[in-house]
Amino acid sequence: MRKFSTNIHIRIAILRRDRQECRHCGEIAKNVSMEIDHIIPLSRGGRDVFSNLQVLCRPCNRRKGNRFAG
């Protein structure tokens, strides 16, 4: 599986859209590392589109793995 990497401008736009808060637990960026996550994982048919990306803190993203969000 390829490692997801995105343009810095898209990453910034997603961080702004999600108010730099983890979409799962609500943690804010100043307290923990944030990552851009695919809501529907690429391995499950998700796409590399803005609407399929969200901000998750590192712990939530690790727990989510390749499962669907929610």
Task: Label each PLM-derived region with a short phrase.
Residues 1-24:
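Short, charged surface segments at domain edges that flank catalytic/cofactor-binding sites
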Residues 2, 60-63:
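Generic cytosolic/nucleocytoplasmic N-terminal low-complexity/intrinsically disordered segments
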Residues 19, 62-65:
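Generic structural signal for secondary-structure transition and capping sites
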Residues 21, 40-41, 60:
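Short, flexible coil/turn micro-motifs enriched in small/turn-prone residues
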Residues 26, 58-61:
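Cys/His-coordinated zinc-binding microdomains
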Residues 27-55, 66-70:
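Histidine-centered nuclease catalytic patch
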